[in-house]
């Protein structure tokens, strides 16, 4: 999982990326291609 300050560019890397908010953190998840997972930090 990548940890980035800004997720907007990471979200654009794949069209199946979803922005999800869990426990106050913002994540990008991708069910089809899990290598695009990221967390804002």
Curated annotation (Swiss-Prot):
Pfam families reported for this sequence: Ribosomal_L36 (PF00444)
GO biological process: translation
GO molecular function per UniProt: structural constituent of ribosome
Keyword Ribonucleoprotein listed: yes
Coiled-coil stretches noted in the UniProt entry, renumbered to this chain: none
Keywords recorded for this protein, A-Z: Ribonucleoprotein, Ribosomal protein
Domain of life of the organism encoding this protein: Bacteria
Record's GO cellular component terms: ribonucleoprotein complex; ribosome
InterPro entries per record: Ribosomal_bL36, Ribosomal_bL36_sp, Ribosomal_L36_bact
Keyword match Ribosomal protein: yes
Listed PROSITE patterns: RIBOSOMAL_L36
SUPFAM superfamilies: Ribosomal protein L36 (SSF57840)
Family: Belongs to the bacterial ribosomal protein bL36 family.
Full protein name: Large ribosomal subunit protein bL36
Organism (species): Rhizobium leguminosarum bv. trifolii (strain WSM2304)
Gene: rpmJ
């Amino acid at each position: 999982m990548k940890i980035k300050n800004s997720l907007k560019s990471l979200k654009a890397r794949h069209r199946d990326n979803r922005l999800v908010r869990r426990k106050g953190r913002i994540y990008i998840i991708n069910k089809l291609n899990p290598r695009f997972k990221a967390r804002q930090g």
